[in-house]
């Protein structure tokens, strides 16, 4: 739903629950 999780994932991982890496930012449905 919310496209931006407020987290970047240049390293390849997201720490925010429910977010996945869509390089270079974390996204969620």
Curated annotation (Swiss-Prot):
Keyword Heme part of the UniProt annotation: no
InterPro entries cross-referenced by the UniProt entry: Cyclotide, Cyclotide_moebius_CS, Cyclotide_sf
Cross-link (Cyclopeptide (Gly-Asn)): 1-29
One Pfam family in the UniProt entry: Cyclotide
Keyword rRNA processing: no
GO BP terms, alphabetized: defense response
Top-level division of the source organism's lineage: Eukaryota
Disulfide cross-links: 5-19, 9-21, 14-26
PTM notes: This is a cyclic peptide.
Keywords: Disulfide bond, Knottin, Plant defense
UniProt remark on domains: The presence of a 'disulfide through disulfide knot' structurally defines this protein as a knottin.
Function: Probably participates in a plant defense mechanism.
Assigned protein family: Belongs to the cyclotide family. Moebius subfamily.
Protein name, entry field: Varv peptide C
Species, as recorded: Viola arvensis
């Amino acid at each position: 739903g919310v496209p931006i999780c407020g987290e970047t994932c240049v390293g390849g991982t997201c720490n925010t629950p429910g977010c996945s890496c869509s390089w270079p930012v974390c996204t969620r449905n």
